Swiss-Prot record:
UniProt-recorded Gene Ontology molecular function terms: acid-amino acid ligase activity; ATP binding
Protein name in UniProt: UDP-N-acetylmuramoyl-L-alanyl-D-glutamate--2,6-diaminopimelate ligase MurE homolog, chloroplastic
Region ranges (Disordered): 42-87, 141-168
Subcellular location: Plastid, Chloroplast
Length: 772
């Protein structure tokens, strides 16, 4: 089925913000091309949060634009602006500056030798101030200072009387140094302030003791854990609600209730390990054994399913029995955190592949429009901007409580929009049931690279749950990849009158499609056709599959009426996505990428995409995890050796399994055994495979990665697959830090030195010069 534009009203906002007549309200209201104020349209419940900019005066254009201006010209402008501001500041505070240097001794007319100064920084500063003062004296702006010997002596004596005796082992300051230090303390505000009392300054004004006002008992106590990666202040919101109010707000109808429904709830958890005093513990099926642990940790109330046997010894103050706790968990969490998604514009991205990269691109696009945008993906969680939260295992296994609590934290810290992955697994389990999505994005649908348990129809229906919520033509949008054969099914979900923006690489009838693209080892260039004009994009994201992700993000920008220049800038800002075909660039002559592909299908598609970049050779490092999916080990080797010129087998989280046993299983993919491989190694030479490709192995991953990188030559592409963004290695019971990306960067520092030393790294083991 072919689509041109699937919206019933195929009209978009123009680049200048003017619109043709249309009957629906866009997700983003029209705004000036030069404006950086973005307002997200909303239904009635959202209008108070996002005022209409049409009610205000039109925004003023900036003084100058940096579009098309070189970096050097930008720096020139900034320097000129800084000089102008400095001159204005001097004129404004002229008297203050003059009085500040009035007490400095006049500088001697003759300069001092460098040897005499001894390189003393403070002497240099004093001399500079004195020279400046002398200049003002010559200009008649200041009067010469009278001799200060008498006054200094008097002040010094007073200071000595107040200080009392000084211990012998401490060097005494001379009188002038004491005065200077006192004045410095006073000028810089370093004089001691009482922890208890306010004080009165020299002018008679009462000053508030900030240490007393914002002491250790203040609610904003300093804690590095409260800071994002960029060290912006991240404030943890506090919530509380009585149990009866929570049940009423969430519309949960209990089967029976015991205890005090007026008990105050200060948190909600369904994992007993995270319970704190005052929390409500929602005991889901399968976690009944953790009731006692939750009780010991201070849970004041419990919500449990009727199938669970509740012990009489529980010390909680209230017990609520419901039909199914899994069904009510999302509603309870959303109500407790005050429905945060209703006050943000939320973009959900579903599909089998491309979700993570697409979320990164959309986040960057929104921020290019001036919108504070959070992100929730399998790789990272961002409040907004580069304020990254450290949430170990949270993003990999999100639950309804975590989703709502993170959204509440984002909203509390000024986030205006949120882009999040909505995987079929999460949608099927109801983890996103209480998220109020505004835009639904569909990337693609395959079953080869997923852990979803169910039929193909169930898998497709799970993804379609996101689109079934697109019912409001004024607020909702659908963004669909029509190269996928399931596109029509997703378009038909929800209200058919909701506008749809389509994208594709093969179907030129899509609203967003490439007119031309060029792939290389280091960048991707694509010319994109859109209803609003043609975009020229240069991206550091490599491969054909990333063009799909770029098109999806562009389609979202078109759907919300974003200015074209913001779309381009937002997409181009994303140079790499952690562990997703991530380019490691140390200015070497060959490419190195790290990717998370750890399944036969994922590895096959990755290597096909790399081959399309036309490298001279592909050198692939791959391993298989221990105690997990032994059946895929031969397949991984077979695919790697068929689609790579050189393959290096290694370990990947062996756990309690012998790495050599894992490698033996992998070698069976080419009909070899470990004994046969080692027999070849007796002569330090491993013959080519039947297809002419080479195969090596090493059970230590760090060694394998560094050797593969050292093999790289101009025009090659080294592919390190399996871990991606994961920064650990599981060996036995130990979890040790390890990062493929850091190992690649480290190895690249020595490649030139190895080659200059005459070491032949094309073979394994390496050949020293004398053995060539």
């Amino acid at each position: 089925m072919a689509f041109t534009f699937l919206s019933p009203h195929p009209v978009f906002l123009s680049l200048t913000g003017t619109t043709s007549s249309f009957s629906y309200k866009p997700v983003l209201l029209p705004f000036s091309r030069n404006s950086r104020t973005l307002t997200v349209a909303a239904g009635p419940a959202r209008r108070n949060s996002y005022p209409n900019p049409a009610d205000d005066d039109p925004p003023e254009a900036p003084e100058d634009s940096m579009h098309g201006v070189s970096k050097f010209q930008q720096i020139q402008r900034q320097a000129a602006r800084a000089r102008k501001l400095e001159e204005e500041d001097f004129e404004k505070n002229r008297n203050t500056y003059l009085s500040a240097i009035a007490d400095v001794e006049d500088a001697a007319e003759t300069g001092r030798d460098d040897e005499e100064s001894g390189g003393d920084l403070f002497s240099d500063i004093d001399r500079a101030i004195s020279m400046k003062r002398s200049e003002f004296v010559k200009q008649g702006l200041l009067k010469p200072n009278p001799p200060k010997t008498a006054s200094l002596k008097k002040i010094g004596e007073e200071g000595n009387e107040e200080e009392g005796d000084v211990t012998d082992d401490v060097d005494e300051l001379d009188e002038e140094e004491v005065v200077d230090l006192d004045e410095i303390d006073k000028l810089t505000g370093l004089t001691e302030i009482s922890d208890e009392e306010d004080w009165v300054d020299e002018e008679g004004n009462t000053r508030i003791n900030k240490k007393k006002e914002f002491g250790s008992d203040h609610q904003f106590e300093f804690d590095l854990d409260d800071f994002g990666e960029s060290k912006a202040r991240i404030v943890e919101p506090k919530f509380k609600m009585c149990l009866a109010e929570l049940l009423d707000e969430s519309k949960v109808v209990p089967i029976s209730v015991y205890g005090d429904l007026d008990v105050e709830i200060t948190g909600i958890q369904h994992d007993s390990r995270g319970v704190s005093a005052g929390d409500l513990f929602v005991c889901c099926l399968g976690s009944e054994n953790f009731l006692s642990e939750a009780d010991k940790r201070g849970a004041v109330a419990v919500v449990a399913s009727k199938e669970i046997d509740i012990e009489d010894t529980l010390g909680c103050r209230a017990l609520v029995i419901v039909e199914d706790t899994n069904a009510v968990l999302a509603a309870l969490a959303s109500s407790f955190y005050r429905h945060p998604s209703k006050n943000m514009s939320v973009i959900g991205v579903t599909g089998t592949d491309g979700k993570t990269t697409t979320t990164y691109l959309i986040k960057s696009l929104y921020e290019a429009m001036g919108v504070r945008t959070g992100m929730f993906s399998t790789v990272s969680c961002y409040i907004h901007g580069d304020n990254k939260l450290d949430t170990p295992n949270a993003t990999m296994n999100p639950d309804a409580v975590l989703v709502q609590s993170l959204m509440a934290k984002m909203l509390h810290n000024g986030t205006e929009s949120l882009v999040m992955e909505a995987s079929p697994q999460e949608l099927a389990l109801g983890k996103c049931d209480e998220v109020d999505f505004d835009i639904a994005v569909f990337t693609n649908l395959t079953r080869e690279n997923t852990d979803f348990r169910g039929t193909d129809e169930e898998y497709r229906d799970a993804e379609a749950k996101l689109f079934s919520r697109m019912v409001d033509p004024e607020r909702h949008r659908k963004v669909v990849n029509i190269d996928d054969p399931n596109a029509a099914f997703f378009v038909q979900q929800g209200n058919p009158n909701v506008p749809v923006v389509t994208f594709a690489m093969e179907n030129t009838k899509a609203d967003v499609h490439p007119l031309k693209f060029e792939l290389s080892l280091f960048e991707t260039q694509v010319l994109v056709n859109t209803p609003q004009g043609i975009l020229e994009i240069s991206s550091g994201l490599l491969g054909r599959h990333n063009i799909y992700n770029i098109l999806a993000a562009v389609a979202v920008g078109i759907a919300v009426g974003a200015p074209l220049e913001d779309i381009v800038r937002g997409v181009e800002e994303v140079d790499a996505v952690p562990g997703r075909c991530e380019l490691i660039d140390e200015e070497q002559a060959f490419g190195v990428i790290v990717d998370h592909a750890n399944t036969p299908d994922g590895l096959s598609r990755l290597l096909d995409s790399i081959r399309e970049l036309k490298p001279r050779r592909i050198i692939t490092v791959i391993g298989c995890e221990g105690e997990n999916e032994r059946g895929k080990r031969p397949l991984m080797t077979k695919i790697a050796t068929e689609k790579s010129d050189v393959t290096m087998l290694t370990s990947d989280n062996p756990r309690n399994e012998d790495p050599l046993d894992i490698l033996d299983d992998m070698l069976s993919g080419i009909g070899w055994t470990m004994q046969e491989y080692l027999k070849h190694g007796e002569h330090d030479y491993y013959p080519p495979l039947a297809n002419g490709h080479r195969l090596f192995l090493h059970d230590i991953r760090r060694v394998a990665v560094r050797c593969a990188v050292a093999m790289g030559e101009e025009g090659d592409m080294v592919v390190v697959a399996g871990k991606g963004h994961e920064a650990y290695q599981l060996e036995g019971e130990k979890k040790e830090f390890y990062d493929d990306r850091e190992e690649c960067r480290e190895a690249l520092q020595y490649v030139d030195e190895l080659h200059q030393a005459g070491i032949d790294t094309s073979e394994f083991p390496w050949r020293l010069p004398e053995s060539h």
